[in-house]
């Protein structure tokens, strides 16, 4: 009996031997989450959720609190790193057909939506000029909901405009939701290891598995170290790389910025929102830009799981990546030609991937059957 237990421990979490570096982003995300919760806790100690004091409290943290500037910048840059890792993680899932493990994919999509909500609440907290106006624009989209829109918006704001109650509840939500993210992440990991990881070939790994530790754990440590080195280089040399210049001014409801935009990691969804002139249509497109990921397990038609051996699907995938980057770029620009037409065109390309992918799978099946 003891020999069986020893064998179990030494072979704890068997993993396919051929999984590549793209499989390391899960552990990198775990490190990002830990970093965000730790720095967030120390920032919350000194932060004041009041519209008259919030901006000053952030300045106080940066200037007066010992190592406060490190905590504040780590939290800001860490959020960007988090989204870089999660978008890469999702892209890997799309490329290698990991969405066919439905429970893992759907729990991951839920995690993404929760993360985006948390990041949005956090962006409002410094109460800078861009924080205030981005919050006003995004929360105002709720008024597009027929019949209930205005009531829901007033309830969320805690009044008839964004004010002190709004900031207080956004701070409360930004503090509490990360604990829900920890729970969802645990569920995501449990569901994944219930069936086991896929591999770049999209084949069954049961005949060729090795223990996660020490083989893959060292591989994870390497990429995580590179990520942390990059994080600290940005922190040391260009700490304001991801910040908006407008956000260094205190929120002023009487002055509207020339160009309102959220953080860079929301720009793809914001670009899709802006490309549609109708408010309700834009809001639905914004929601669908993320929710459409949930359709992937149900629209896979190809006999082959991974895109490794699907050249047509690969072309569509890299078009999606190029589209994602282009939408992000256009959304950071003012609403004027040629950015309007570029944004509208790329939005069509973005959604067309989710329509074309099953059609391509069906076409590839036909080609394979003929040979």
Curated annotation (Swiss-Prot):
Binding site residues for a ubiquinone: 193
GO molecular function: metal ion binding; ubiquinol-cytochrome-c reductase activity
Cofactor annotation: heme b
Cofactor note: Binds 2 heme b groups non-covalently.
UniProt xrefs under InterPro entries: Cyt_b/b6_C, Cyt_b/b6_C_sf, Cyt_b/b6_N, Cytb/b6-like_sf, Cytochrome_b, Cytochrome_b_C_euk/bac, Cytochrome_b_N_euk/bac, Di-haem_cyt_TM
Superkingdom as given in the UniProt entry: Eukaryota
UniProt-listed GO biological process terms: mitochondrial electron transport, ubiquinol to cytochrome c
Entry GO CC: mitochondrial inner membrane; respiratory chain complex III
Membrane topology term: Multi-pass membrane protein
Binding annotation for heme b b562: 75, 174
Annotated Pfam families: Cytochrom_B_C, Cytochrome_B
Metal-binding listed as a keyword: yes
Localization terms from the record: Mitochondrion inner membrane
Family to which this protein belongs: Belongs to the cytochrome b family.
Misc remark: Heme 1 (or BL or b562) is low-potential and absorbs at about 562 nm, and heme 2 (or BH or b566) is high-potential and absorbs at about 566 nm.
Job of this protein: Component of the ubiquinol-cytochrome c reductase complex (complex III or cytochrome b-c1 complex) that is part of the mitochondrial respiratory chain. The b-c1 complex mediates electron transfer from ubiquinol to cytochrome c. Contributes to the generation of a proton gradient across the mitochondrial membrane that is then used for ATP synthesis.
Assembly notes: The cytochrome bc1 complex contains 3 respiratory subunits (MT-CYB, CYC1 and UQCRFS1), 2 core proteins (UQCRC1 and UQCRC2) and probably 6 low-molecular weight proteins.
Protein name as annotated: Cytochrome b
């Amino acid at each position: 009996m003891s020999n069986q237990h020893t064998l179990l421990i030494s072979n704890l979490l068997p993993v396919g031997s051929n999984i590549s570096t793209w499989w390391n982003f899960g552990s990198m995300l775990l490190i990002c989450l830990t970093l965000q919760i730790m720095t967030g806790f120390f920032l919350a100690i000194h932060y004041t959720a009041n519209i008259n004091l919030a901006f000053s409290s952030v300045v106080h943290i940066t200037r007066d609190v010992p190592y406060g500037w490190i905590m504040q910048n780590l939290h800001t840059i860490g959020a960007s790193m988090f989204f870089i890792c999660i978008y890469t993680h999702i892209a890997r899932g799309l490329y290698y057909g990991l969405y066919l493990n439905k429970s893992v994919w759907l729990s991951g999509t839920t995690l993404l939506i929760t993360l985006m909500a948390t990041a949005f609440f956090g962006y409002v907290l410094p109460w800078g000029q861009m924080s205030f106006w981005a919050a006003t624009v995004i929360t105002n989209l709720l008024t597009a909901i027929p019949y209930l829109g205005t009531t829901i918006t007033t309830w969320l704001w805690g009044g008839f405009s964004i004010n002190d109650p709004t900031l207080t509840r956004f701070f409360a939500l930004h503090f509490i939701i990360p604990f829900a993210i920890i729970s969802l992440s645990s569920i995501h990991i449990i569901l994944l290891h219930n069936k086991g990881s896929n591999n770049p070939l999209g084949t069954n790994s049961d005949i060729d598995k090795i223990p996660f530790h020490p083989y893959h754990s060292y591989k994870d440590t390497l990429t995580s170290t590179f990520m942390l080195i990059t994080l600290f280089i940005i922190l040391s040399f260009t700490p304001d790389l991801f910040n908006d210049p407008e956000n260094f001014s205190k929120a002023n409801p009487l002055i509207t910025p020339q160009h309102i935009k959220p953080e860079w990691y929301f720009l793809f969804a914001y670009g899709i929102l802006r490309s549609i002139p109708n408010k309700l249509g834009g809001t639905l497109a914004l929601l669908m830009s993320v929710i459409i990921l949930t359709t992937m397990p149900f629209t896979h038609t190809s006999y082959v799981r991974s895109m490794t051996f699907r050249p047509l699907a690969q072309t569509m995938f890299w078009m999606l990546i190029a589209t994602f980057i282009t939408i992000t770029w256009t959304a950071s620009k003012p609403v004027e030609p040629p950015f309007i037409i570029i944004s509208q065109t790329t939005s069509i390309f973005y959604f067309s991937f989710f329509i074309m992918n099953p059609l391509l799978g069906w076409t590839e099946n036909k080609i394979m059957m003929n040979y």
